[in-house]
Amino acid sequence: MGILNDDAVLIEPGKISGDPTVVTVNCPDESGLGSTLCRIILEFGLSITRADFSTDGRWCYIVFWVTPDISSPKIDWDSLKNRLLSACPSCLGSFYFCLQSNVSKPPSLYLLKFFCRDRKGLLHDVTKVLTELEFTIQRVKVMTTPDGRVLDMFFITDAMDLLHTKQRQTKTCDHLTAVLGEHGVSCELELAGPELESVQRFSSLPPLAADELFGPDGFDISGSSSNKAVLTVDNQLSPAHTLLQIRCVDQKGLFYDILRTSKDCDVHIAYGRFSSKVKGYRNLELFVRGTDGNKIMDPKHQANFCARLKEEMVCPLRVIIVNRGPDTELLVANPVELSGKGRPRVFYDVTLALKSLGICIFSAEIGRHSTLDRQWEVYRFLLDESREFPLASLRARNQVVDRVTKTLMGW
């Protein structure tokens, strides 16, 4: 393992306006590093338009071409570089030593509470501030009182690991107060101890809703969806690697989905090329090996890996609307990696989509749901009925699902 310096991560702006920014990472390798780097890039509201990836198992070299999402026009490139450097193994530079030495320590969980008057788009505006401050939202409880006020409780972790300081806490509350304006009433931050466990509890999903989200008939990727992702396995071209060729519909987070799935399936990528989009499709070439360092020759292993990849590319997130008593509830399910993390910015994108439709959120929560073979992060939004958007209408419900799905997928 080598000693890294600032040159381990280089960020080169595009030469003209509209050109992608080139992010180069050159550092020691470790299992799942590519997936971790993609996750960080997504957290900053960036889309990966191209990528080249190569590793010999000890050292890796990755080049990302990235562009800001429409909803993230301002990017803190210095902060992105710091985060990428902190993810690289053997970051022994004095500035990053503290970050790297605490990599194995789980981040402290904090509870952010604020009480204010409700308005359309409030939840997204707060989420936007937290995202820009580099907080990760782990759990949420949002409740509206009969007099039109809202109590929001966000369980958050800090990517900068500075929330224990008075300066960071003050900056957070000041930013929120500036956004809430006259709507703001109070803002509190505290370390989330065991006594707050009951507040974090996630109400269980109704069986019918769970069936629709996770059942075998809920999201069928066969049939008409099969042309969205085509995978070809070749064990003849390379003497040491299995070549996996992929052609699929482009979407936000596609390269991340492929890398996280490969990691969870114990498939190691030695070389990968994520080509530019052509007519809405992406072409990828991955030279891969199994955990034993050899080609993937077992037909059953090949079939299982390809089936899992196809599912994650065609249907990485699940979105439905159900009745919850007399009310209407939006459910979004996000697969959780074996590392325990789900796709970033899901809450941000869903609240953005609902704000764009002018739909108020009466209550919201984030929790975990386990199925036979995996764990899911589930987002529940109880939606306010309005004259402008009658949610009893099937057409209106389909419009909500369509807008949320397209925002999540970057379509």
UniProtKB/Swiss-Prot annotation:
Residues 22-105, 111-194, 243-322 form the ACT domain. Keywords: Repeat. It holds the Pfam family ACR10_N. May bind amino acids. This is ACT domain-containing protein ACR9. It comes from Arabidopsis thaliana. The gene is ACR9.
